[in-house]
Each structure stands twice: as structure tokens, then as C-alpha cells.
Amino acid sequence: MVKKAHVTTSVNGDEYEYLCEPGQTLVDVLRNELELTGTKEGCSTGDCGACSVMLEGELVCSCLVLAVETDGKSVETIEGMAKGDDLHPLQRNFLELNGLQCGICTPGVLIAAKALLERNPNPTETETRFWLAGNLCRCTGYDKIVRSVMAAAEEMRGA
């Protein structure tokens, strides 16, 4: 019998302690142990980006990260994006410009877009498309998503 690992991690600024199997993925723990179901599991192979989260400030596919790897580290998920009732500019622009439809890819796209804008507050359309290439959307295509990110970037710059 495999011994469970004790993990302490910060998720969206809140401290969590849990036990997990050594091979259990971060997306599984987020959804099933911590009940943070905004992060979606689409492919389990890192190809779709639906499970994108920030780990220690780096964009990762949480289906490829073992939960034990987050011990002592910080994780940011879609649940931490809004501040109370105030939506993040990306969330607001996605709603206003119809940058989402079914919602499966949306949390991962929003996390990836936030990571982009934290690194490059004034991306070109080409840079935005390149950055989001790891996030698959089968509903909208990408034009409305890219327009939403570009509008949020402009808003965040105060332009």
C-alpha cells in the first residue's frame, strides 16, 4: 500500500493542507479535494490548456503537475482572479465581447491571458495569438478571445 503524502500549499492566497496519492495530479486535487472546480480537465495530456493554472508565477497545465510538487508553493486558479464581486478586466471583457461560449476552455484561457499581460502589458495581436496557442477552443474560434484580451490589455494600461 502506497503511503499518502502530506502537502501544504497556498491556493489563491489561502493555505491548504491535504493528503494525496503520490501520483495524483494537481487538477484532481483542486477539483476533488479542494472543491475548486473552475479549473477544467480536458485531455489529461497537457494538449488543451483547459487546466491551466499559475504555479509559483509560471503558467502550467495542472494535469501534468503532481500535487506533491506543490508542497510549500503557491498556486493561482481561476477562482482567485476576481476580487470579491469585482471581475478582473479580462473576465469583464470576455463577457462584454463574447469571448466565451461553452466555458470549458475559458478558465484556462483567462489564466493564460493573465499570465501574458503580467509579462507583457501591451502585446500585439500576433503575440497574443502565440501566447494562447496552448489553449484549445472548439466553440468560438479565437478572434473574439483575442479581441477580449487586447481590450483588457488596453483597459489595464489605462489607455
What is each of the regions a protein language model found here?
Residues 1-159:
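Signature of N-terminal electron-transfer/Fe-S-associated modules in redox systems
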